Every structure is written in structure tokens, then in C-alpha cells.
Amino acid sequence: MALHTVLIMLSLLPMLEAQNPEHANITIGEPITNETLGWLSDKWFFMGAAFRKLEYRQAIQMMQTEFFYLTTNLINDTIELRESQTIGDQCVYNSTHLGFQRENGTFSKYEGGVETFAHLIVLRKHGAFMLAFDLNDEKKRGLSLYAKRPDMTLELREVFQKAVKHVGMDESEIIFVDWKKDKCGQQEKKQLELGKETKKDPEEGQA
């Protein structure tokens, strides 16, 4: 499921802050600093998620893979999101902007007159982060995982599994991404190579 779509469809309530997150090795409610924003400005891979609501689970199953780029703007506190999704045999591109609230550590998306929120959970040690949604609603709650590399370590997998159980869900509800099904990575690589060749041609013509 696309990151911006998740932010539109789900809204967060801070029930998790009332729990003890140490059991899942996660920290809730940390302020978002410029250092964090610099760390987030990178390429990210959607690794998996656990969502209670059926249509959200189905949306994840329809999307084979997703990677995206985050570019932060410190002047107006927004984040540009550029994503590439593999859906079937197609590579689908999309771009949008996210807001963020520094004090309570949340991302936000304003759509159709409604602003929804997701709590950012940084897993810096693992080069990853999670987003938590609707944790007070047993039928809608969800947790998603993103990492800087598509090859997930066993330790990161276990951290996410523990976090999912900690918010009252079951490991069986997790859908992990199979990056062997990615169609967008090769396309991006070809576009980058083509761009390099295009830059070389004018130089060769002047030689």
C-alpha cells in the first residue's frame, strides 16, 4: 500500500504512548529533529505491514513492492514523497507532499479537508522506521515497516513482529514484501543509465 494512501486512509490516536514500548524495542512520541529529518531524506523500501481492516490488507496484497524517496523541506516543514510501486507487471509512479509535527513525532496528510496522522517510530539502529495507525481501534489498527535496504535482517524482522504483538495484533496478520517481484528497480536503473549516456553525448559532440 502506498505510504501516502496509508496516511490518507488511517488516522492515529496516541494509545501506544500509554503502553510500555520497551518490550518491542521501540520509542513512541519522540520529537522530530532536523537530524531525524536529514536521516529520513533518503530512499526507502516498504518491507511489510499488519492491518486489521480487510480492504487495507487487500490493497497491500495487490501491490507487490514499493520504494520511495523522501526529501524534507525545513522551511515549510513538509516532506516530498516520490514513490514507485509494482502492481502486477506494471510500475506505477506517484508523488505527493506530507506534513510533519516536530513536537509529537507525527506525519500528516491533508486530503479532502481532513488531516490524518501517523506516529513515526524510528529504528535508527536497523536503518528503518515504523508508522503506527488507529491503535485505539481493534478493528482498524495497523503498523507498517520501512527500511533503507530491501534485504531484511532477521533482527529487524523480529523487532517488527514483537511490535505488532505489542499493539494487540498477531504475527499471522503481517504481510511481508517479496522483493523478487519488484519491477520498478530495473526501470529506475535503466533510466539512470540513460540519463548518464545523454549527458555524455553533448560532451562527445564538442570533443
From Swiss-Prot:
The record's note on its domains: Contains a beta-barrel that binds various ligands in its interior.
UniProt superkingdom: Eukaryota
Gene giving rise to this polypeptide: Orm8
Misc note: Eight genes coding for different forms of alpha-1-AGP are present in mus carolis.
Sorted UniProt keywords: Acute phase, Disulfide bond, Glycoprotein, Secreted, Signal, Transport
Tissue-by-tissue expression: Expressed by the liver and secreted in plasma.
The name this protein goes by in its record: Alpha-1-acid glycoprotein 8
Function recorded in the entry: Functions as a transport protein in the blood stream. Binds various ligands in the interior of its beta-barrel domain. Appears to function in modulating the activity of the immune system during the acute-phase reaction.
Organism: Mus caroli (Ryukyu mouse)
Similarity annotation: Belongs to the calycin superfamily. Lipocalin family.
